[in-house]
């Protein structure tokens, strides 16, 4: 009887141990190295999607938080050096409330820049896709829509322009 009980316990433990799946540690953006099918709601209320992107244009996606000091510094640096980033479409994406994004956009006068799109990711798709741990997170795609580089804690304009 003891042998039967011990054998049963071992079977249960083995079943539980082998039932555990290894967590997939490779982020989705590395598995699928092309621009994802995203949808953000811009501060003007319109949707901006992958299909909205201009053809043959590099893309910079910056996932940020408007109240993050590093994100504010990153934004200012990008705006001050826009001559180096003018050839790219820049998406500033956050999860915060739209009112906060509008305030951020107005503060930095983002509407002056035709290549910048700021909006909210209401489904939290992009941070999940990029496995964002810190903000600002920056992903760069080339003219063909192929993933080039990710910066997990922001990047200088010089670093970014090297990948455009």
Spell out what each predicted region is.
Residues 20-51:
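N-terminal "domain-start" segment that seeds a small globular fold
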Residues 108-139:
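Short, internal strand/loop/helix patches
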Residues 50-72, 78:
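Short active-site neighborhood of thiol/selenol oxidoreductases, capturing the structured segment around
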Residues 72-110, 125-128:
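Structural microenvironment flanking redox-active thiols in thiol-disulfide oxidoreductases
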Residues 57, 134, 140-164:
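Thiol-/selenol-based redox modules, centered on thioredoxin-like
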Residues 1-25, 164:
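Bacterial Sec-dependent N-terminal signal peptides
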Residues 35-36, 59, 135-136:
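Short loop/turn microsegments at loop-to-beta-strand junctions
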């Amino acid at each position: 009887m003891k042998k039967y009980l011990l054998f049963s316990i071992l079977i249960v433990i083995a079943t539980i141990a082998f039932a555990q799946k290894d967590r997939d540690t490779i982020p989705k953006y590395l598995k699928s190295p092309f621009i994802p099918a995203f949808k953000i709601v811009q501060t003007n209320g319109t949707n901006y999607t992958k299909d909205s992107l201009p053809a043959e244009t590099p893309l910079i996606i910056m996932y940020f938080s408007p109240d993050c000091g590093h994100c504010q510094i990153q934004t200012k640096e990008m705006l001050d050096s826009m001559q180096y980033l003018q050839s790219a479409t820049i998406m500033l994406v956050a999860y915060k409330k739209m009112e906060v994004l509008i305030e951020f956009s107005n503060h930095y006068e983002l509407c002056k820049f035709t290549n910048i799109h700021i909006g909210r990711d209401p489904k939290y798709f992009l941070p999940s896709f990029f496995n964002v741990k810190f903000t600002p997170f920056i992903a760069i795609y080339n003219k063909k829509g192929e993933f080039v580089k990710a910066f997990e804690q922001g990047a200088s304009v010089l670093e970014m322009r090297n990948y455009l």
